[in-house]
Amino acid sequence: MQLHYVFSHLQNSFRARKSLASVPNCNSVLELCAVLYHQGFLSSIQRGDIHGPDALPTITTRQNVATRRLWLGLKYFEGKPVLHYIRAVSKPSRKVNLTPSELLQFAKGRKVSFVNGLEPAEVGIVETKHGIMSIDDAIKNNLGGNVICRVK
């Protein structure tokens, strides 16, 4: 699963105090990064190639799709990473699908089935039929889905 690669790559990039991180350019990764950006964990998202962000916008075609990357600006506060950790909740061997009411309990910090609830200042990210979104947006829209990860 490509998202698990992104989780570990982001954590390693933050720990190495990098200013930019490069991740594969695909729709699911872009949606995940957009949620992280809106939640304040990333400072920017840019498209580019394997050498760096594009200076001028470049269209992705069949000829260049293998070299296209997303370049993420990593955010720090007083020299410390804003993102402390990003952990997978659903795994290929164990999917965690929750209903809207179970998502609400999970967001309140209560244990749902075999998954511990969110801690204070932790953000849950959910894959719904409308795409990847934060747990707050899923609850507002009364959507259930697959809990992908938790971020703090």
Swiss-Prot record:
Record key words, sorted: Mitochondrion, Ribonucleoprotein, Ribosomal protein
GO process terms (BP): mitochondrial translation
Chief site of localization: mitochondrion
Protein location: Mitochondrion
GO cellular component, one term: mitochondrion
Superkingdom assignment: Eukaryota
Record GO terms (molecular function): structural constituent of ribosome
InterPro entries assigned: Ribosomal_uS8 (IPR000630), Ribosomal_uS8_sf (IPR035987)
Pfam families referenced in this protein's UniProt entry, alphabetically: Ribosomal_S8 (PF00410)
Subunit structure: Component of the mitochondrial small ribosomal subunit (mt-SSU). Mature yeast 74S mitochondrial ribosomes consist of a small (37S) and a large (54S) subunit. The 37S small subunit contains a 15S ribosomal RNA (15S mt-rRNA) and at least 32 different proteins. The 54S large subunit contains a 21S rRNA (21S mt-rRNA) and at least 45 different proteins.
Family: Belongs to the universal ribosomal protein uS8 family.
Function, in words: Component of the mitochondrial ribosome (mitoribosome), a dedicated translation machinery responsible for the synthesis of mitochondrial genome-encoded proteins, including at least some of the essential transmembrane subunits of the mitochondrial respiratory chain. The mitoribosomes are attached to the mitochondrial inner membrane and translation products are cotranslationally integrated into the membrane.
Protein name as catalogued: Small ribosomal subunit protein uS8m
